[in-house]
Amino acid sequence: MSTYAIIKTGGKQVKVEVDQAIYVEKLDVEAGAEVTFDQVVLVGGDKTVVGTPIVQGATVVGTVEKQGKQKKVVTYKYKPKKGSHRKQGHRQPYTKVVIKAINA
């Protein structure tokens, strides 16, 4: 059974495994840099450890592969019979991280 972990980043919880690529909310680091996630909620495998609320001493290490923006989401509001309308687009920034190690 492979080791996995659940980490908290960007206000979300993400299940990760070694050599997995994940997309998280934008982190303030350059591409190629190493990033450490220390808010580990759960470490699973042969023996599962659940944190209260986080697992003490557990970290997940990854490498930032790239920074980018998601596809554009378009919102459109209008009020009938008033000639009022509004169109707005949004592209959410993200960081692609490849998980290298789970230290429990």
From Swiss-Prot:
Q: What SUPFAM superfamilies does this protein's entry cite?
A: L21p-like
What HAMAP family does the record point to?
Ribosomal_bL21
Assembly, per entry: Part of the 50S ribosomal subunit. Contacts protein L20.
Family membership: Belongs to the bacterial ribosomal protein bL21 family.
In terms of PANTHER family, this protein maps to: 50S RIBOSOMAL PROTEIN L21, LARGE RIBOSOMAL SUBUNIT PROTEIN BL21M
Q: What is this protein called?
A: Large ribosomal subunit protein bL21
Q: Choose any GO biological process term that the UniProt entry carries and state it.
A: translation
NCBIfam families reported in the protein's UniProt record: L21
Any one GO CC term of the record: ribonucleoprotein complex
Top-level taxonomic group? Bacteria
One Pfam family name is Ribosomal_L21p
What is an example of a GO molecular function annotated in this UniProt entry? rRNA binding
InterPro entries according to UniProt: bL21-like, bL21-like_sf, Ribosomal_bL21, Ribosomal_bL21_CS
Question: What is the species listed in this Swiss-Prot or TrEMBL entry?
Answer: Streptococcus mutans serotype c (strain ATCC 700610 / UA159)
Coiled coil feature spans: none
Q: What is the recorded function of this protein according to its Swiss-Prot or TrEMBL entry? A: This protein binds to 23S rRNA in the presence of protein L20.
Keywords carried by this UniProt record? Ribonucleoprotein, Ribosomal protein, RNA-binding, rRNA-binding
